[in-house]
């Protein structure tokens, strides 16, 4: 009984802070527009060709799409906003070009970020 009382008192005293923390990471309702942009980014990523000498141009499309999605998730206060901002920063770095190996690693990193958002958003 004392344990239950202690838990209730703790929850009452920390009330607002706990609720705000939970709300920050609680999944938002499904947004088909946001998911559509994520699908489009995945399609663009599949078309990036690291064998081309100017593969940085392929990343410019990714950069524009991820910038749009980053702003959208930020304004919506979606829990995936930080991940999508990271994807945008990654595409900015990749659009500057580099070696073929750098491009291939960049594709893997971008795919992981896209997959993380997909897993978080699917089923909502």
Residue ranges and their predicted role:
Residues 1-4:
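Positively charged n-region of N-terminal signal peptides that target proteins for export
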Residues 19-51:
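Immediate post-signal-peptide N-terminus of mature secreted/exported proteins
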Residues 51-124:
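Intrinsically disordered, glycine/charged-rich N-terminal periplasmic/extracytoplasmic linker segments
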């Amino acid at each position: 009984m004392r344990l239950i009382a202690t838990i209730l008192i703790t929850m009452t005293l920390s009330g607002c802070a706990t609720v705000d923390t939970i709300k920050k990471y609680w999944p938002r309702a499904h947004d088909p527009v946001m998911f559509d942009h994520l699908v489009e980014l995945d399609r663009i990523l599949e078309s990036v060709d690291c064998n081309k000498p100017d593969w940085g141009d392929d990343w410019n499309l990714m950069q524009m799409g991820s910038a749009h999605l980053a702003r959208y998730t930020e304004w919506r206060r979606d829990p995936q906003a930080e991940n999508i901002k990271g994807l945008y920063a990654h595409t900015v770095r990749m659009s500057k070009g580099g070696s073929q190996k750098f491009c291939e690693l960049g594709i893997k990193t971008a795919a992981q970020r896209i997959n993380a958002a997909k897993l978080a958003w699917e089923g909502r």
